[in-house]
UniProtKB/Swiss-Prot annotation:
CDD domains: KAS_I_II (cd00834). Residues 4-411 form the Ketosynthase family 3 (KS3) domain. PANTHER family: 3-OXOACYL-[ACYL-CARRIER-PROTEIN] SYNTHASE, MITOCHONDRIAL, POLYKETIDE SYNTHASE-RELATED. The active site is at C165 (for beta-ketoacyl synthase activity), H304 (for beta-ketoacyl synthase activity), H341 (for beta-ketoacyl synthase activity). It comes from the Bacteria. The keyword GTP-binding does not apply. Its EC number is 2.3.1.179. Keywords: Acyltransferase, Fatty acid biosynthesis, Fatty acid metabolism, Lipid biosynthesis, Lipid metabolism, Transferase. InterPro entries: 3-oxoacyl-ACP_synth-2, Beta-ketoacyl_synthase, Ketoacyl_synth_AS, Ketoacyl_synth_C, Ketoacyl_synth_N, PKS_Beta-ketoAc_synthase_dom, Thiolase-like. It catalyses: a fatty acyl-[ACP] + malonyl-[ACP] + H(+) = a 3-oxoacyl-[ACP] + holo-[ACP] + CO2; (9Z)-hexadecenoyl-[ACP] + malonyl-[ACP] + H(+) = 3-oxo-(11Z)-octadecenoyl-[ACP] + holo-[ACP] + CO2. Signal peptide: none annotated. GO terms for cellular component: cytosol. It comes from Staphylococcus aureus (strain MW2). This is 3-oxoacyl-[acyl-carrier-protein] synthase 2.
Length: 414
């Protein structure tokens, strides 16, 4: 059996509520910029939820031909824009000689929800003949991968993961394993989501998952007293990851190394996490085992931290159970306090934050930290970014259905 290949991050692309590229998103994260505001895309008057993390000053026609864009749901559009940025950042040349060894693995938690709503109205109002022939290709979650592959010409391993809020992290983890075992030289991977629609807002509201707080400064407050649910966000986070051999051969810039991946199932409940965060704890331990490290080796953890009453507390318990005494010295921040919860895209954005934290020796804060929950007594990097020399960083994603996914990143050393 051949030795596992080392896997490094060489490119990044982002669309988020705090920036339309990686540079802006990261700068605003370090500044503690709040990307949550009143929803403008739909009329929220009938709903109890009125806030979300929308993209700002973003026009898809600046990036994709208008005719082509009309044949894609927003989640696919976002993936293409972020993937192009990541590939450009990596200076990755996809040509007839390399295409077979470059793959795409991008997930979406719910796919084309807006497309479904439009098509359903057409069907009900005007009958089946008015439903677009592009309806199914626009709807299905794997189409982000499909369209990015077509757009960039990448012909290697090609797939999509759908694990709700763990989607982005699971996608990167699966792509990591593909490169690690030598099935591809590079993968374009991450998550994308466009969930700010009538049906998504109504559905998540019905499940009592969303915050009904109309104050943009307190609606999303992970690990704080009085938190009442998550605030939805939209966007995409895409990485180019590749074997160290490939990256060094072409002189690529390396942000960080991916060294561990753990994924588990709760087998407990369709929306609630397992008691004491047992499933998340096992995923964190699996990721550390995969990386060959111990809890004391990790300096920073980008938490799932969605601002739900049960979810935050269970994640804190999981961290304490996994890290033991080392949890007292761990920096743990929830960047969702700034971006909102991007569902399937969140793991991609937070992988970018984790890698840049290592590279820049800075940790983005948990903003809105003014009324700490005494049961969530970790160092959550309150309100202001902190300088921190990081060797290992971890990123958690925990999804409806009991999906738990964790990645471990390492400061790159040749």
């Amino acid at each position: 059996m051949s030795q596992n290949k080392r896997v490094v991050i060489t490119g990044m692309g982002a669309l988020s509520p705090i920036g339309n590229d990686v540079k802006t998103t990261w700068e605003n994260a370090l500044k503690g910029v709040n990307g949550i505001d009143k929803i403008t895309r739909i009329d929220t008057e009938p709903y109890s939820v009125h806030l979300a993390g929308e993209l700002k000053n973003f026009n898809i026609e600046d990036h994709i031909d208008k005719k082509e864009a009309r044949r894609m749901d927003r989640f696919t559009q976002y993936a293409i824009v972020a993937a192009r940025e990541a590939v450009k950042d990596a200076q990755l040349d996809i040509n007839e000689n390399t295409a077979d060894r470059i793959g795409v693995w991008i997930g979406s938690g719910i796919g084309g929800m807006e497309t479904f709503e439009i098509a359903h109205k057409q069907l009900m109002d005007k009958g089946p003949r008015r439903v677009s022939p592009f309806f199914v290709p626009m709807l299905i979650p794997d189409m982000a991968t499909g369209q990015v592959s077509i757009d960039l010409g990448a012909k290697g391993p090609n797939g999509a993961t759908v694990t709700a809020c763990a989607t982005g992290t699971n996608s990167i983890g699966e792509a990591f394993k593909i490169v690690q075992r030598g099935d591809a030289d590079a993968m374009i991977t991450g998550g994308t989501e466009a969930p700010i629609t009538h049906m998504a807002i109504a559905g998540f509201s019905a499940s009592r998952a969303l915050s009904t707080n109309d104050d943009i400064e307190t609606a999303c407050r992970p690990f704080q007293e009085g938190r009442d649910g998550f605030v939805m966000g939209e966007g995409a986070g895409i990485l180019v990851i590749e074997s160290l051999e490939s990256a060094q051969a072409r002189g690529a810039n390396i942000y960080a190394e991916i060294v561990g991946y753990g994924t588990t199932g709760d087998a407990y409940h369709i929306t609630a996490p397992a008691p004491e965060g047992e499933g998340g704890s096992r995923a964190m331990q699996a990721a550390m085992d995969d990386a060959g490290i111990e809890p004391k080796d990790v300096q920073y953890l980008n938490a799932h931290g969605t601002s739900t009453p049960v979810g935050d507390l269970n994640e804190v318990k999981a961290i304490k159970n996994t890290f033991g005494e080392a949890a007292k010295h761990l920096k743990v921040s929830s960047t969702k306090s700034m971006t909102g919860h991007l569902l399937g895209a969140t793991g991609g954005i937070e992988a970018i934050f984790s890698a840049l934290s290592i590279k820049d020796s800075k940790v983005a804060p948990t903003i809105h930290a003014v009324t700490p929950d005494p049961e969530c007594d970790l160092d959550i990097v309150p309100n202001e970014a902190q300088d921190l020399d990081i060797t290992y960083a971890m990123s958690n994603s925990l999804g409806f259905g009991g999906h738990n996914a964790v990645l471990v990143f390492k400061k790159f050393e040749a």
